[in-house]
Amino acid sequence: MIELIESNLPVVTIDRIFPNRISIVSDNEKGITDLVSYIIEKKHTKIAYIHGRDSAVTRQRLASFREVMKQHDIVVPNAYIRETDYRDIQRTAIATAELLKLPDPPTCILFPDDYAAYGGINVIKAAGLRIPEDISVAGYDGISLATKIEPKMTTIKQDTKTMGMLAAEKLIALIEKPSTTEIVSITVPGILLPGATVASQ
């Protein structure tokens, strides 16, 4: 991917930000703000966050998570913050198991994405815990599978259709008018899907 980014070929990135490249990104800051605010409205204060590997997207999401918690005067223990890879079921399962073993475990776990969340959900069920009666969880992305399982995942749905359309339009513009196409980063808002995996405390 880096070779492509550093080449002279026309490139538009989706949910990745690189210097001197057009990018189409989901509004990660607002997405996490909306999601964490919803969880706090449900009276959760012990919220853990398993985030993805370091990237511009991850930094935006983590900063927003910390900011919302700070605004509500909620202290986040270092042990509640874990790192895994996006879409990595196995590593997310390990991180979830570590959180459950804490002396004061969280009442809600925020996963890096809906797909990786399945690793955590499997560990929670294997521990004999029920979602959301015993522990709440939330994902990110809003993949179609997340809306089909029971209980339905609480998540942020990214507007991938709009993002794809904008990326295609900008790529065509780069090909047809390379010297006049402005290098911009376009932010596309997502939407909160309340689902049923976050219970009131």
Residue ranges and their predicted role:
Residues 5-201:
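Bacterial carbohydrate/catabolite-sensing allosteric modules
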